[in-house]
Amino acid sequence: MANYYSDINEIKFELENSPLMQRIVELKELDYADKDTHDYAPQDFADAMDSYDRLLDIVGDITGNVVAPNAEAVDAEGAHHENGRVRYASKTYENLQAMNQAGLNGMTMPRRYGGLNLPVTVYTAANEMVATADAGFQNIWSLQDCIETLYCFGTEEQRQKYIPRVCAGETMSMDLTEPDAGSDLQSVMLKATYDEENGCWRLNGSKRFITNGDSDIHLVLARSEAGTRDGRGLSMFI
């Protein structure tokens, strides 16, 4: 039974010996403010580190015994088009199910939305193991961190609507690239027009080369201010 965490000492060594780790945890846990309201919230630094160690061991077990063994079959089958949607390879759904059953979604999101409230440092360690097992699957699973954008810049209504969905396992993408706008995102021309009659925005244009582009929730970059041609006329739409 392989384990990409316990079998490889590097990640554990780095977390346990980082001189900044205690401060990172204190900042993320806001002096352990959740300990009285959430049963699984850490009581102190030692408790937090023990929780991270246990969680990363679960990630290591899934990546070593599910994701990595499935990688060859995923490559052989590939994604395919079916009834207007893109379907992952069958083993990719098996990978997602294993991660979802273990509760490994919304990892950095606050507990009040159903997240695990992990520091990005710990989430990145988990991400490294997933990428080691199957870099293609890592592209799907790790795009849960698109929700950070909504958490930082969205309204509280948007947070309550979308963050719990990601924490429950729905997938995400960030739709940026267009036929004439790749690395130069200031050239994005997907047009966003406000529909006053229906109280919503209408998007008209093209996107392409979108990683995980048939996800459940999309953050779409579009030009919302008519007559602009740089980054100041762009907005992100859910």
Residue ranges and their predicted role:
Residues 1, 45, 49-53, 82-86, ...:
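Hydrophobic alpha-helical scaffolding
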Residues 1-82, 86:
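Extended, charge-enriched "interface" segments that sit outside catalytic cores
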Residues 25-31, 70-80, 109-111, 138-143, ...:
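Short coil/turn segments at secondary-structure boundaries
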Residues 60-61, 91-168, 211-213:
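Internal helix-loop-helix
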Residues 142-143, 154-190, 199:
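Internal maturation/activation junctions in enzymes
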Residues 187-194, 221-222:
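Short beta-strand elements
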Residues 200, 204-238:
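A short core secondary-structure module
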